[in-house]
């Protein structure tokens, strides 16, 4: 896994990092004078785990949070936890025929990526695959939006998405791409075995080459007047149809 230094902000994101990955939290900054009990809990847990904690003014937190609302807390974090492409094979093998892989083809808005990761973690996915280029990466905004989910699931960054899709197929992963013009409904296909769910970016959807590497295309039926969903909403709908089938509902 590759690592990089970054700041994460927000109560849920910092609390999750302190709880789940304390070894990679370098320090925690908390707004001086705050009486928020959640911040007190974070401070106490961080100190118990040997993490440096500093009380600072709001301006200092504004400086590390940028445009992201910090909620009075920030942490300097050492790991982006991006898994290498060659680690994906082992993750699929370990799923023993029930791998559920989410492939995001060029989701560029970090808020959308964070929301997708949150849904993916809730659905218990095996891994999330993103391209290294033309895609949001796991930055502070993504961590905050994901409410800590970015720390809980493998995010695999790949150089060549088409090659990655071929490799998944060689492992017996059946790839379904989500496309509004598809004839088959999401609710008509079997999502219980080794399955990869492929969703495109906000503007253009699935790229041509990505589409060509899918084993099938499906759509979410929309009887209303709106014919499209935000990618993070579509991700949640698609993942939890897979969950429903796998639970036998």
Curated annotation (Swiss-Prot):
One of its GO terms (molecular function) is RNA binding. Keywords: Cytoplasm, Methyltransferase, rRNA processing, S-adenosyl-L-methionine, Transferase. It catalyses: guanosine(2251) in 23S rRNA + S-adenosyl-L-methionine = 2'-O-methylguanosine(2251) in 23S rRNA + S-adenosyl-L-homocysteine + H(+). InterPro entries: 23S_rRNA_MeTrfase_RlmB, Alpha/beta_knot_MTases, Ribosomal_eL30-like_sf, rRNA_MeTrfase_TrmH, SpoU_MeTrfase, SpoU_subst-bd, tRNA_m1G_MTases_N. S-adenosyl-L-methionine binds at residues 200, 220, 229. GO terms for cellular component: cytosol. SUPFAM superfamilies: alpha/beta knot, L30e-like. Its EC number is 2.1.1.185. It is an enzyme of class 2 (transferase). It is found in: Cytoplasm. Its main location: cytoplasm. NCBIfam families: rRNA_methyl_3. Specifically methylates the ribose of guanosine 2251 in 23S rRNA. PANTHER family: 23S RRNA (GUANOSINE-2'-O-)-METHYLTRANSFERASE RLMB. Belongs to the class IV-like SAM-binding methyltransferase superfamily. RNA methyltransferase TrmH family. RlmB subfamily. This is 23S rRNA (guanosine-2'-O-)-methyltransferase RlmB. It comes from Xanthomonas axonopodis pv. citri (strain 306). The gene is rlmB.
